[in-house]
Amino acid sequence: MTERFVTPDFSSEEDRLEASLRPRVLTEYIGQSKAKGNLQVFIDAARGRQESLDHVLFYGPPGLGKTTLANIVASEMGVSIKSTSGPVIEKPGDLAAILTNLSDGDVLFIDEIHRLSPVVEEILYPAMEDYQLDIIIGQGPSARTIKLDIPRFTLVGATTRAGLLSSPLRDRFGVICRLEFYTDDELATIAGRSARILDIPIEKDGQYEIARRSRGTPRIANRLLRRVRDFAQVKGDGIITRDIADMALSRLEVDNCGLDHMDRLLLLAIIDKFAGGPVGLETLAAAVGEEKDTIEDVIEPYLLQNGFLNRTPRGRTATERAYRHFQRQIPRGKTSGELFS
């Protein structure tokens, strides 16, 4: 099995390392200038009024800094953060236990918030709006509801699939921030910062070589930095240069556009097996042996953003850029315009 180095998902070891690289305050945070600027205003205003921050929703592809920003919000507000995720909160009682253990002003961070069950969401609505829990006592005709006050808190939700959030839940967030892919300059700066923290000697050209293959994602840039460090140590003099980074990333099968073996497998399946498409998601998932959700949430966003793939009402199609990247000819009778239709 080939290890995937450009997936934005965490491994357990990386979770610990990533925490050490995270900025603690907004002024240290690189990139996302629009979201960062707005957050700074909202945080300063809330602190000035001595109120808890309004509920915040971060959404965007994996690895762009949603968890980091949630921790920064808590740090900037000078409060504690309690972290959990949608799939972990299975029953209303699980959420009630978390909410009743919060202190005034605390941040509750729920990752993958789109995966909360409807029955758990129902408990969350009055908690977000009125800072109360509706507790049902008894059963049947004699059942009654009592309201339990809870501390004022800030809910920070994170999701890769904002479209799956129910409207009532989405409407209760006062601050909604969409996170974008990072530029090469921003990723090079992040790679340089991480290298300093980890005490890794790196040249400017080495930073940019890692950055341009990191798929616009800081988490991937940090992962590639650590793997390139290994090659620099064993195959070089310990310093990450452009040549060392190029050699290492080529050995890891990450090409100069940031595509890895899974991206190539998916794009070449569309080009070679389905004549460029369109092909349905289920058929494509079966053809490459991957889960549909993984294709939609992890693989496709970068390919769509960078013009390698297109979604149409009839399915996925490979774009002209994908054909050029793999040095393939557009099929006879199919114009470049039709690849985008």
Swiss-Prot record:
UniProt xrefs under HAMAP family: DNA_HJ_migration_RuvB (MF_00016)
- The record's EC number reads 3.6.4.-
Provide one Gene Ontology biological process annotation.
DNA recombination
Origin species:
Syntrophotalea carbinolica (strain DSM 2380 / NBRC 103641 / GraBd1)
Give the similarity note: Belongs to the RuvB family.
The residues listed in the UniProt record as binding Mg(2+), with positions renumbered to this chain, are T67
Name where it's found: Cytoplasm
* Name of the protein in its database record: Holliday junction branch migration complex subunit RuvB
**Biological role stated in the UniProt entry:** The RuvA-RuvB-RuvC complex processes Holliday junction (HJ) DNA during genetic recombination and DNA repair, while the RuvA-RuvB complex plays an important role in the rescue of blocked DNA replication forks via replication fork reversal (RFR). RuvA specifically binds to HJ cruciform DNA, conferring on it an open structure. The RuvB hexamer acts as an ATP-dependent pump, pulling dsDNA into and through the RuvAB complex. RuvB forms 2 homohexamers on either side of HJ DNA bound by 1 or 2 RuvA tetramers; 4 subunits per hexamer contact DNA at a time.
InterPro entries assigned to the protein according to its UniProt record, in alphabetical order: AAA+_ATPase (IPR003593), AAA_lid_4 (IPR041445), DNA_helicase_Holl-junc_RuvB (IPR004605), P-loop_NTPase (IPR027417), RuvB-like_N (IPR008824), RuvB_C (IPR008823), WH-like_DNA-bd_sf (IPR036388), WH_DNA-bd_sf (IPR036390)
What is the protein's quaternary organization? Answer: Homohexamer. Forms an RuvA(8)-RuvB(12)-Holliday junction (HJ) complex. HJ DNA is sandwiched between 2 RuvA tetramers; dsDNA enters through RuvA and exits via RuvB. An RuvB hexamer assembles on each DNA strand where it exits the tetramer. Each RuvB hexamer is contacted by two RuvA subunits (via domain III) on 2 adjacent RuvB subunits; this complex drives branch migration. In the full resolvosome a probable DNA-RuvA(4)-RuvB(12)-RuvC(2) complex forms which resolves the HJ.
> Which intervals of the chain are annotated as region Head domain (RuvB-H)?
256-341
Q: What is known of its domains?
A: Has 3 domains, the large (RuvB-L) and small ATPase (RuvB-S) domains and the C-terminal head (RuvB-H) domain. The head domain binds DNA, while the ATPase domains jointly bind ATP, ADP or are empty depending on the state of the subunit in the translocation cycle. During a single DNA translocation step the structure of each domain remains the same, but their relative positions change.
One Gene Ontology cellular component term attached to this UniProt record is: Holliday junction resolvase complex
Task: Name the UniProt key words of this record, in alphabetical order.
Answer: ATP-binding, Cytoplasm, DNA damage, DNA recombination, DNA repair, DNA-binding, Hydrolase, Nucleotide-binding
Q: State the superkingdom.
A: Bacteria
Q: Which reaction does it catalyse?
A: ATP + H2O = ADP + phosphate + H(+)
A GO MF annotation of the entry reads: four-way junction DNA binding
**Which positions are annotated as binding DNA?**
R311, R316
